[in-house]
Regions:
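Catalytic-loop of the protein kinase fold
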Residues: 9-26
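Conserved activation segment of eukaryotic-like protein kinases, specifically the C-terminal portion
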Residues: 52-65
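Conserved catalytic-loop aspartate of Hanks-type protein kinases
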Residues: 81
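Hydrophobic anchor on a C-lobe helix of Hanks-type protein kinase catalytic domains
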Residues: 92-93
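C-terminal lobe of the eukaryotic/viral protein kinase catalytic domain
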Residues: 96-141
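Regulatory extensions flanking the kinase catalytic core
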Residues: 148-186
Length: 195
């Protein structure tokens, strides 16, 4: 999923509505390829990579995108997609949303400003690896300049410290490459594997 978004960003495309509902499994089973859908809000950005339109699903939106709804002068970059990836990873690891929309606005805004660290408390997180928690926190970094890009996320130890998992993921991608779209599967340079 992160590699898919990395590919979009390499084409200067920001998805702007990454969420669980827009992810599909190619087939049943634990080892299925994830497919990204719903490009209705996707945007090709120009010089400087600046986006200014309030777009997306609020529960997954980065703070700088939410600010576009409140201020005329606010803008954001493709790193807003990285925030959404952090929300998705948080949900998959803990089974709950880091910044629930049903909270009063002031409480939700406070949680957003605090980022992920305070949201990763309790029993749900006690069994999650330090590397996974670190990646979630780095993706849910409030400051977009300090937030991980997709390239940086793919180089994170949570992805790179288990070569067998990486190799299985790369094999799955290669085995499931689509012959319909004519694109050749390309190995991400962040992954170093042996065939």
């Amino acid at each position: 999923m992160v590699d898919c978004v990395r590919y979009l960003h390499s084409l200067n495309i920001c998805h702007r509505d990454l969420k669980l509902e827009n992810l599909l499994l190619a087939r049943p089973g634990a080892r299925s390829l994830i497919k990204l859908t719903d490009f209705g809000l996707a945007k090709v950005w120009g010089l400087g990579g600046i986006l200014e339109t309030y777009a997306g699903t609020p529960a997954y939106m980065a703070p700088e995108v939410l600010a576009c709804n409140m201020q005329d002068a606010s803008s954001y970059s493709a790193k807003s997609d990285c925030w959404s990836l952090g929300v998705i990873l948080f949900l998959l690891l803990s089974g709950r949303h880091p910044f629930p929309c049903n909270l009063p606005d002031k409480e939700r805004d406070k949680r957003l400003r605090e980022g992920a660290r305070n949201a990763m408390q309790g029993v749900r997180w006690s069994h999650i690896s330090e590397e996974a928690r670190d990646l979630v926190e780095a993706l849910l970094e409030v400051d977009p300049e300090r937030r991980l890009s997709c390239e940086e996320a793919l180089a994170h130890p949570w992805f790179t410290n288990d070569p067998s998992t990486l190799h299985a993921a790369l094999k799955l991608m290669k085995d499931n490459q689509s012959s319909q779209n004519g694109h050749q599967w390309r190995r991400n340079p962040a992954f170093k594997t042996e065939d």
